[in-house]
Amino acid sequence: MNDRISINLIYLVLTFCCVSAATVRTAKNDDIQKFTIQMIGYSPQKTDDYVAVSIEATPGYVVAFEPMAHADRVHHMLLYGCTMPASEQGFWRGMETCGWGGGSYILYAWARNAPNLVLPKDVAFSVGHEQDGIKYFVLQVHYAQPFAGEVHDFSGVTMHISQKKPMNLAAVMLFVSGTPIPPQLPAFQNNITCMFESSTPIHPFAFRTHTHAMGRLVSAFFKHDGHWTKIGKRNPQWPQLFEGIPSKLMIGSGDQMSASCRFDSMDKNRTVNMGAMGVDEMCNFYMMFHYDAKLDNPYPQGAICAKDYPSKMIDYPKDGFELLPSRPELEHHAHQSKVPFGIVQEAIHENLGGVKLGQVAGLAFNNEQQLLVFQRAGRVWDASTFDNYNILLDKKPIADPVILVISYSGNQTKLERKLGGGQFYLPHGIYVDKDGFVYTTDVGSHTVAKWKIEGNELKNIWTSGELLMPGSDQHHYCKPTGITRVEDQLYVTDGYCNSRVVVLDLNGKRIRQFGLPGEDAGQFNLPHDIVSDSAGRLLVTDRENGRVQHMTTQGHVIEEFKSTMFTNIYSAASHEDYVFMVPGRPIMGHETEGIAVFVGRSGTGLIEYAFGPTTKGKREQMGPQFGQPHCLRVCPDGGHIFVGDIAEGKARLWQFKIRHDQN
């Protein structure tokens, strides 16, 4: 493996590759299983980097596809069904997908942030059966450029697989041209034509177009008895989804199928060839069709059309050449970043404004996008901090300020104010609501509190729980850990001893609670952090169960984020539809491999990419790595990520910047 790949993530990559390149989950409909094939935590090594992973196909019928990728990171993905993969290794570099001597079938294609695809009723792809020739799934991923920073990608596709054989089987035909594009032309057409020769009629029901930056329109029609019928047309600069065909179509034996790609080469001073690289172009029209499951497969070895018969295109419909009206909102959504995506380590802070950091236990942003750092100053939580009954032994509050309010620009910080001296015993969680009130949890005093900042003073509004007295009843907490607000209620993770979420009103009055000790859904083994997402749902960090539970405010589990790549999760944060998670400890037995931040997509329960501190390549050249990450937050505009570290003797605040075009 190239030395450039982050050493601290190599173990994670290899674990994911060797243990499983697929995840199988049962959907709410018991007939449907969700089968996911993912990249192995790859970091592209060059421009136009093609890689692939394979996994043995599970028998069934695919009725839907969920992509798990973003155009910031991935140029496109192609999912194939293969009799044999091109390599037996499970992962390989290069453009090969299916092996020689067997079938090669396109099942799905994705680019430019295309959405999910659900097939029509009674239509599905047959996979994993002897007669369909698909024994393996192969996912090919094209990365346009290397990432910035130490980012590792787990993009993939989730298939919804049923065991019920449908009335109609699905397949995909690819129309592809190899004609070069001359320079300085406002409109150049690449044409493709084939004759349909099977006795099994086919019914197109969806289509997808694909070009690179020069493409302006891709269309396809078929000709029956001298009459042209449109299959579809679309601007390839829009999200490259499979668009449904509204009318019922049938292509029969002897019909002509044709496609055309329109290119604009006015800004080119050389001929542009067709090819897989970014400097090349592509002319692709994907036609998804179904046929009667009782009839023979019309394309038993895979469906492709790559011929050009100019004489047969003379009467191609004018509509197939005419541009569609501009759709700026689609072009923006489909935008592929020209700036390499990355999460770059921007700074490591060991002191802020002359204040040496203690263990950084909590982080929060206020309404001015200033960061509140909740740190323990000179007090350290170790084996001598509590007795066997969870009672704090040093009952004096921390004299030094424990809340540091900072502003930041680039890697420079400014200490705006210092708060909380003499008011806290062992800081843990902190949150600032939309009204500017500050909420804290203190594991030393076993309390939850609401505060108001007045100048350089921290004024207490109320305190919930009995000072320095742990308990599990309705009036006590035992080492409460995190707090967040959703609408007019507060949600407290309680915590190290009680394995519950306590719900308060804004005046600190208890309303209810949910959660029990355990590892089932809705149970906890040390709920360590809690945040809310943009929809007002909760993300509870279930630390020792090694997961984040995505829950309603009533405590019902929507999904969980869990992986073999970590055994514990200390903190989580949410921005838009992404969930950021950080373990506090490496996997036992692999302590030298380091720790990474994992990022999943809401609604999937899967990890989509990971990142960590900067490395310089070889192990002996590695820079500072995470010690014991304890808290993580993403700034409100999504541009920065901060991680608080409580490692003994190495308390730090890590600062990362998310790089993409919007920055």
Curated annotation (Swiss-Prot):
One of its GO terms (biological process) is peptide metabolic process. Cu(2+) A binds at H75, H76, H142. Its EC number is 1.14.17.3, 4.3.2.5. Residues 301-663 are annotated as: Peptidyl-alpha-hydroxyglycine alpha-amidating lyase. It catalyses: a [peptide]-C-terminal glycine + 2 L-ascorbate + O2 = a [peptide]-C-terminal (2S)-2-hydroxyglycine + 2 monodehydro-L-ascorbate radical + H2O; a [peptide]-C-terminal (2S)-2-hydroxyglycine = a [peptide]-C-terminal amide + glyoxylate. NHL repeats lie at residues 411-454, 464-507, 511-554, 626-656. Residues 1-300 are annotated as: Peptidylglycine alpha-hydroxylating monooxygenase. Glycans are attached at N191, N269, N411. Zn(2+) is required for the lyase reaction. Monomer. In the C-terminal section; belongs to the peptidyl-alpha-hydroxyglycine alpha-amidating lyase family. This is Probable peptidyl-glycine alpha-amidating monooxygenase pamn-1. The lineage of its organism: Eukaryota, Metazoa, Ecdysozoa, Nematoda, Chromadorea. The gene is pamn-1.
